[in-house]
């Protein structure tokens, strides 16, 4: 029997998220794995690995906000917006004051805008990923996506090496590489990401993340704890058999459209969605079953 739950992984640089998850699967002989959002090849930090039935809650954890530390190199631009790409533009360095940087940074606080993702990304257009268009030199229309930058803080400014180091808290779907380019545009220059580290995914923190070499089943976080850690609405329901059978249920005084249902022992059994007034219907069941 295998348990279900999540691992908080600390992804190293120069390995894809897919490779990382696959290595966890092989190392622990896990039957079913998934993840809650990719990181760029060169990026490091928090990756949520879903194990067995926890893959059923991927959409909910994927919607969580994120936090990053990012270092931006000014006066040079690459086609991928990071150090992995080819240099496509350079600019003669000029003086950018600390006040100018702080003024631009202050714009990106509780700031919602339409962001264009990089061409080298996994977003699909007409069934193909954007980077596939780039690799074959095909033209494709890149559509913007609405994102929110909740807070941007300047950690340091290295004027000698033309590097800005930022801490960013943002909504799901934000491309930090695109944000870096947008910030540089506001500074009337160009730039690309030379360092990116995800420090937070939902309420899962980097300091609690496990390196691949040290991972064991002891580090598994249960589905119950994963859901409660991220402050989802959890409602206790007396008749757990109705939940197991996937029946519609009545929940009074619930304003949320989506709730997790637990039994008397606080085991989360399913996700329910509001159907009509106080009637809820099952959206995802079988969350508390282990895999045999």
UniProtKB/Swiss-Prot annotation:
Domain of life: Bacteria
Active site: 40
Catalytic activity: uridine(55) in tRNA = pseudouridine(55) in tRNA
GO biological process, one term: tRNA pseudouridine synthesis
Keyword tRNA processing: yes
Entry's EC annotation: 5.4.99.25
UniProt cross-references to Pfam families, sorted A to Z: TruB_N (PF01509)
Keywords: Isomerase, tRNA processing
GO molecular function: RNA binding; tRNA pseudouridine(55) synthase activity
Function: Responsible for synthesis of pseudouridine from uracil-55 in the psi GC loop of transfer RNAs.
Record-stated family: Belongs to the pseudouridine synthase TruB family. Type 1 subfamily.
HAMAP family found in the cross-reference section: TruB_bact
Name assigned to this protein: tRNA pseudouridine synthase B
Organism: Mycoplasma mycoides subsp. mycoides SC (strain CCUG 32753 / NCTC 10114 / PG1)
